[in-house]
UniProtKB/Swiss-Prot annotation:
GO biological process: one example: translation
Disulfide bonds: none
Name of the protein in question: Large ribosomal subunit protein uL30
Molecular functions per Gene Ontology: structural constituent of ribosome
Native organism: Clavibacter michiganensis subsp. michiganensis (strain NCPPB 382)
């Protein structure tokens, strides 16, 4: 199954609380943090919410 590599590239300072919560749900705590998540609708929604703060790569 395909997976997503999500890297936080911008700070969450001065972002809305729901975006901060979304980063925490993804497991991202600091700039440069990387997590690998399953590619499903839920995780795509999380990534879409914070798209301006993260970089996403698809991996097989």
């Amino acid at each position: 199954m395909a997976q997503l590599r999500v890297t936080q590239i911008k700070s969450k300072i001065s972002e809305k609380q729901n975006q901060r919560d979304t980063l925490r749900s993804l497991g991202l705590r600091r700039i440069g943090a990387v997590v690998v998540r399953e590619d499903n609708a839920q995780n795509r929604g999380y990534v879409n919410t914070v798209a301006h703060l993260v970089k996403v790569e698809e991996i097989d």
